[in-house]
Amino acid sequence: MEKNAEKKRIVLVPFPLQGHITPMMQLGQALNLKGFSITVALGDSNRVSSTQHFPGFQFVTIPETIPLSQHEALGVVEFVVTLNKTSETSFKDCIAHLLLQHGNDIACIIYDELMYFSEATAKDLRIPSVIFTTGSATNHVCSCILSKLNAEKFLIDMKDPEVQNMVVENLHPLKYKDLPTSGMGPLERFLEICAEVVNKRTASAVIINTSSCLESSSLSWLKQELSIPVYPLGPLHITTSANFSLLEEDRSCIEWLNKQKLRSVIYISVGSIAHMETKEVLEMAWGLYNSNQPFLWVIRPGTESMPVEVSKIVSERGCIVKWAPQNEVLVHPAVGGFWSHCGWNSTLESIVEGVPMICRPFNGEQKLNAMYIESVWRVGVLLQGEVERGCVERAVKRLIVDDEGVGMRERALVLKEKLNASVRSGGSSYNALDELVHYLEAEYRNT
């Protein structure tokens, strides 16, 4: 019997945090433009209020077994474990209902690597499944390596400086001390998550939001190591206009930027989940003030209990918002540098606009990205240890004023052109998207 002539349907299952939802929605928009219908399965906490950004998308709710508010209380590892243990039944019911509703037209379930419970439903209902990793290819490589380690032995081995500085085989300049384990809770539990993430089960492919011009060696490693196709499609945010934010963006900062000099502003944003201590905020404020450069600072809701001193400093030279339209900010000609936590989305967005970075990572994956920003791509400065006003001032001047910053900006602009070329017709990411579409269509015909 021939398949239904209507659009083939893709079901997307994002992990319920901003940094994971945004690229998943961008992927959905890219596939929608290629002729697929898109259904997005979200928990109650993530129901989309601005559906006008995604005309034609269907949104379905998976009843939450654990509220998103528990993420910070439990920590990311325990939240992921609990979410996966308790979500399978409600998700299967949701997909079974979709099959009845749409006449078995689901071509594939694409799920975030942290939502690995989705694979069991796909297998039971005989639907092809594909994994989407929203981090870097190098981070996925690290998960593969970590999944094979014994936690107790690794902790002992890593006390030896010689082991710490050993380069991971075929992955220069990645060293064992760079493997992203810090800030993730008990190591043994984290390694269990790594094992779940890299276990492809019956998934038929892996999609990564990256480009071969940024991570060629890591992508080559994955293509050799994994037994299924790997599709590097990034940066997805240049190929689509998807704009989904769980937090309300304050656009007044664009008006403020319009009044600033060319490449003079340092933009500061540390992501949607990172918290800062009051002392660190104060030292940052004084360092920024002493640099004599204007600054745009995102201090999100829940972290605004600042000393009065900070408000006075900011009123003279800066602008504070609770959340900014980041892509618009980074493309603005007044922005000369980006102080970032180095989440992968922010890293891609900054490089795509040719903006060099001050790197202040909080956890293991962010530290991995920061190492590549500073040492591999050489488009940023890494701030380590306690934040102190003198080091903040020096970092800003290195980036905005000194010749060193000029070199970083030139290298960032070269990468910008390479990344933009990769998503144009004939580019590596453009071709990878076409290959993925053909693959999904073939999988659909064979079901």
Swiss-Prot record:
Coiled coil: none annotated. It is an enzyme of class 2 (transferase). The keyword Cell membrane does not apply. Its EC number is 2.4.1.-. It comes from the Eukaryota. InterPro entries: UDP_glucos_trans. UDP-alpha-D-glucose binds at residues 272, 324-326, 341-349, 363-366. Disulfide bonds: none annotated. Pfam families: UDPGT. The keyword Transferase applies. Keywords: Glycosyltransferase, Transferase. GO terms for molecular function: UDP-glycosyltransferase activity. Belongs to the UDP-glycosyltransferase family. This is UDP-glycosyltransferase 76E5. The lineage of its organism: Eukaryota, Viridiplantae, Streptophyta, Embryophyta, Tracheophyta.
